C-alpha cells in the first residue's frame, strides 16, 4: 500500500481561534485568585476548597461561562459561537464531498436537558445555523459496540457529518477518518498523549482528504492559554526523553491536574510578562531542588571517597589473611 501523509491546511500546524474574555469571566478569574489565597493561607479545609477545584472551575469558565454561572447569557464572542461559525462554514464548503468533522470537549458532557451542557447548546446552535439534526451526533449516545460501529460507519459514509465527543470516548478505537476534513479542540486536555489521540483521529491513513484543518479555541485571559502552553512544554520534554536526550535529568508529572497559586495569580493578571515570570519561577524552583539533590549526592560521594583508602587497606589485609589460610590447607582423606 502506498503511504500518503495527511497534512494541515493552516501552515502545517493547528489554527488558533482566539476569543476575548467577557467582563464577567475576568471578574470570575479574580475570585479564583481569592480562593487560591485562602487555600495558601490555610483559611479553608481541603475538603471545602482546593487547587484542583479552582482549576476545574477556571477551565469550565474558559469553555463557557454558563458552566459556572447558569443564569449568564450566551457569549456571542465566546468559544461556542466561534466553533459554530467554523463548523458551519466547513460543512457548507465540503457539502459535495460530504466532509465530516470532529468536535472534542472533555468538560461538559450531554445532560439530556437536565442542566446546561455545551454539547446540547452547540448542537442546537448548529441546527439553528442550518445543519440538519440527523447529520449531528454525540459519541456518548452510542453505548454498545454495535451502536458505535453503526455510528462510525455513518461518519465514514458522510451521513453523520459532525460528531461530538470526549477524548475518553472518541479517542482510541475511533476509526472515522475517511471523510474527516476538520477537527476542533473546544477545550484543552491535560496530557500531551490526549492531544495526540485526538488529532490521531484525523491525521491518519485512510483519510481521503490530503489536507485537513485542526482548530484550537482559546479564551484570552483565561486558563486556556496556559493549558496549551503547558501541554506544549510537556510534549517537548517527552519528545526529548524519547529521543534519548541525556541532558534531560527529570520530567514533571504529566498527570498533574491542578495549577499552583502562583500560576492562578499570574493568569488573573492578564500580563504575559507576569505569566512568563510564573513559569520561570516554577523552573527556578525545580532547578533549585535538582541542585540540592545533586549537592547532597556530591557530599555523599566525597565522603565515600574519603573512606575508600581505609576500606582498601582493610580489604587488602583480609586478602592477605585469606591467602595465608589457603596456603596452609591440608588435604583431607577419607
What are the roles of these predicted feature ranges?
Residues 1-73, 88-92, 214-289:
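Inter-lobe coupling linker of SF2 helicases/translocases
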Residues 22-25, 108-110, 143-144, 169-171, ...:
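Conserved nucleotide-binding/hydrolysis micro-motifs of P-loop NTPases
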Residues 43-54, 96-120:
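Conserved strand-helix element at the start of the C-terminal RecA-like helicase core
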Residues 88, 125, 261-334:
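C-terminal accessory regions of helicase/translocase ATPases
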Residues 107-140:
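Conserved helicase motor "Helicase C" RecA-like lobe of SF1/SF2 P-loop NTPases
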Residues 123, 132-167:
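Conserved helicase ATPase core of P-loop NTP-dependent helicases/translocases
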Residues 175-188, 212-216:
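A short beta-strand element within the Helicase C-terminal
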Residues 191-209, 231:
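Conserved SF2 helicase motif VI
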Amino acid at each position: 500500500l502506498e503511504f500518503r501523509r495527511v497534512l494541515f491546511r493552516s501552515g502545517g500546524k493547528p489554527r488558533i481561534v482566539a476569543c476575548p474574555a467577557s467582563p464577567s469571566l475576568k471578574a470570575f478569574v479574580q475570585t479564583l485568585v481569592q480562593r487560591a489565597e485562602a487555600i495558601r493561607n490555610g483559611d479553608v479545609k481541603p475538603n471545602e476548597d482546593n487547587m484542583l477545584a479552582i482549576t476545574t472551575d477556571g477551565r469550565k469558565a474558559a469553555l463557557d461561562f454558563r458552566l459556572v454561572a447558569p443564569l449568564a447569557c450566551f457569549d456571542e464572542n465566546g468559544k461556542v459561537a466561534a466553533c459554530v461559525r467554523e463548523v458551519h462554514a466547513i460543512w457548507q464548503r465540503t457539502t459535495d464531498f460530504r466532509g465530516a468533522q470532529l468536535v472534542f470537549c472533555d468538560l461538559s458532557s450531554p445532560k439530556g436537558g437536565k442542566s446546561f451542557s455545551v454539547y446540547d447548546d452547540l448542537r442546537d446552535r448548529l441546527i439553528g445555523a442550518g445543519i440538519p439534526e440527523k447529520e449531528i451526533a454525540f459519541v456518548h449516545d452510542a453505548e454498545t459496540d454495535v451502536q458505535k460501529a453503526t455510528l462510525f460507519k455513518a461518519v465514514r459514509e458522510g451521513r453523520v457529518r459532525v460528531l461530538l465527543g470526549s477524548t475518553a470516548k472518541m479517542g482510541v478505537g475511533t476509526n472515522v477518518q475517511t471523510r474527516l476534513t476538520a477537527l476542533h479542540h473546544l477545550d484543552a486536555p491535560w496530557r500531551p498523549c490526549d492531544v495526540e489521540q485526538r488529532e490521531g483521529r484525523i491525521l491518519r491513513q485512510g483519510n481521503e482528504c490530503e489536507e485537513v484543518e485542526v482548530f484550537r479555541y482559546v479564551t484570552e485571559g483565561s486558563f486556556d492559554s496556559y493549558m496549551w502552553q503547558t501541554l506544549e512544554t510537556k510534549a517537548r520534554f517527552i519528545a526529548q526523553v524519547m529521543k534519548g536526550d541525556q541532558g534531560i535529568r527529570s520530567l514533571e508529572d504529566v498527570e498533574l491536574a491542578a495549577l499552583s497559586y502562583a500560576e492562578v495569580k499570574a493568569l488573573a493578571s492578564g500580563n504575559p510578562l507576569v505569566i512568563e515570570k510564573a513559569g520561570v519561577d516554577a523552573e527556578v524552583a525545580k532547578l533549585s531542588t535538582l541542585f540540592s539533590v545533586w549537592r547532597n549526592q556530591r557530599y555523599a560521594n566525597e565522603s565515600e571517597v574519603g573512606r575508600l583508602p581505609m576500606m582498601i587497606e582493610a580489604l587488602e589485609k583480609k586478602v592477605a589473611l585469606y591467602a595465608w589460610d589457603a596456603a596452609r590447607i591440608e588435604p583431607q582423606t577419607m
